Every structure is written in C-alpha cells, then in structure tokens.
Amino acid sequence: MIRIETFGEYNRVVLLGEKRNMFSQQLIERLSGVNCDKNLVITNEGPVFSAGLDLSVFLQSKDAVLEYLFGVHRLVKRFIGCGSRVVAYVSGDVYGFGVEFLYFVDYVVAQRENIRFSLQGVNFGVFPPYTIAIGRSLFSHGHLRVMLNREFNAEEALHFGIVSQIGQLEPEKLFKPPPYLLGLLSPRRWLGAVVDDAIPYLYMLAEVGTREETRDRIRKFLGRRREN
C-alpha cells in the first residue's frame, strides 16, 4: 500500500498503486501513521497518483459514509499540521480527492506536462468538498470554471497553482528556512484557519452521495472500471 524510504533530509512515502491509490480506509490509516516531523516527499508507483475517494463507500449507509469522510478530514488536518515540509512528486494521473489532497502540501512537482487531473466525481454526484468550500480562497473564478467542468493537464494545473513545477524533483533546490519559520512561510499551514469550512459540505456529500441516483451512477462506473 505504501513504502517509506529515507534519503537525505526527506522521508519518501511511495504509494504502491494498490487499487489505483484510492483513499481507502486502509490507506488513510497508513498515511495517518506517517511521521511528519521530518520532511516528506509523497509520490507514486504506476500510472495513477491517486484515484481519489473510495467510491464503494457510498454504497454503504449514510453513517458509514460520514465516518469515512471525517476520517479523510482528519487526515487533511494532520497534513496541514505537519511540523516539516511536505512535497508531492506526481508521476501519474490524479482524480477527485487526489487533486484536492495536493492543496494541502507545500510544493507539488508534476513529472510531465501530460499528466491528467480531473474532479470527475461530479459526474456521479460525488462533488469535491474542499474545492467547493475553500476553492475561492485558492483559485480564480476562471480556474474553477475549468476545474469543475473538465479534466486538465499538468501544464494547466501549473497555471492554476495546483502544481508548483513540472519536471524532476530536486528537493535540494528548495529553500531551507529554520524550522521555527515554517509556520509563517507555509501556505499549507494557513489553510488550517479555513479547512473546517468544508465540514457542512461533508454532511451534504454524505446525503447526496447516498441518494439512489448517485449510487446507480457509481455502480455503473465501478462496473465499467472492473471490465477494463
């Protein structure tokens, strides 16, 4: 599910591609246990950085969905509160909450321009709660119109501000401020003041996501994915 490697000043957390690195309950638990007192690089093996939320959860009870979504929210807050720098090195396509997760790290490097980013869950009724809640603080109106209507590539994501750089990860070229300044210099930390604005949308997502129409769309999507 994940592999942790140590190199230099960073620990590298490698998402191993199981179930397209969707944020299953197991992956959430493993990531929640990662020590982030040391600088982290989060990256992936395989063609997908993350497939986003575990859509199969929405076929369960509303209470189960809420429990799952608040587990996701606790993970987000944990990474916002990490004491050291968190960098994402994206070498595969990114979907749904996988895109939103990148809002909560310090620096994002996409390996190449043609990596795809998509908030495609809106097609099933599974809307992106963090984009809806705090997206207007992060992106322009024009960028949100693209993000919420079609997939986009890494070059566009760089223009929007989701991606910081396209190319190879070179952590040694990043600034190295003393630890006591990281809280002042990290936009990720600033999001701690607004991230709970997403909570009403988590409740709304649990309600919308368990409607029978939404579940029918999810079943069809999961069925097509299994066939492929």
Roles of regions detected by a PLM:
Residues 44-75:
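Glycine- (often His-adjacent) and acidic-residue-rich active-site loop
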Residues 30, 71-83:
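Catalytic-core regions built around general acid/base machinery
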Residues 1-45:
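Conserved CoA-thioester-binding segment of acyl-CoA-metabolizing enzymes
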Residues 47-51, 95-96, 116, 192:
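Short, active-site-adjacent cap segments at secondary-structure transitions
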Residues 9-10, 34-40, 60-61, 82-84, ...:
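Short glycine/proline-enriched coil/turn segments at helix->beta-strand junctions
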Residues 78-83, 87-97, 101-181:
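Crotonase-fold acyl-CoA enzyme core
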Residues 1-7, 17, 49, 153-154, ...:
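C-terminal alpha-helix plus adjacent terminal tail
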Residues 13, 31, 42, 54, ...:
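Terminal peptide-recognition signature
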